[in-house]
Regions:
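A short, hydrophobic coiled-coil helix within the histidine kinase transmitter core
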Residues: 4-8
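Short helix-capping segments at alpha-helix termini
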Residues: 11-16, 42-45
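EAL-family c-di-GMP phosphodiesterase catalytic domain
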Residues: 18-32, 45-154
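Conserved functional hotspot residues or short segments at active or partner-binding sites
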Residues: 38
Length: 154
């Protein structure tokens, strides 16, 4: 798998410095024995990996020690429930502290309200993803810079 992926990326001339592959928490567990060697091989070659949907309740914290990831993406349900569930901010802070101990960046998903940005930053979140910043769009549209989705969400 690792050799196939390297050839695919090389064939398209993509810059690895601008690419970070996501491993979903669920898929990492389902195919761990297959995924781990491939991820380790690619990470040794400088590839970036993010553990996606972390905190969804599927993986143990041990996967942060086993998988050579550089980024942890906090499951969006924790962000969605940030203001209504008092435990969500506590879990986010704990995940941020754990990631910091490993030297990992933390991304919060599903950020749909810009008012959450200061609170998430105070808990240790490095980056956010969601409609608060930008609506999804096709790569070709983003590259052209003239997509109707280019405007931040209201």
């Amino acid at each position: 798998f690792a050799d196939w992926l390297k050839a695919l990326i090389a064939g398209h001339g993509l810059d690895l410095g601008r690419l970070c592959l996501e491993i979903t928490e669920r898929h990492a567990l389902e195919r761990f024995e297959f995924a781990l060697p491939a991820v380790r091989t690619l990470a040794a070659d400088g590839w970036c990996f993010a553990l996606d949907d972390f905190g969804a309740g599927v993986a143990s914290f041990g996967y942060l020690a086993d998988l050579p990831v550089q980024v942890v993406k906090i499951d969006g349900r924790l962000v969605r429930d940030f203001e209504s569930d008092p435990i969500s901010p506590v879990i986010i802070e704990a995940l941020c502290r754990l990631a910091r101990l490993r030297g990992l960046r933390v991304v919060a998903e599903w950020v749909e309200d810009a008012s959450l940005l200061p609170a998430l930053a105070a808990l240790g979140v490095d980056d956010v993803q969601g409609f608060a910043l930008h609506r999804p769009e096709l790569l070709a549209e983003a590259a052209a810079g003239d997509s109707p989705a280019s405007a931040p969400a209201a």
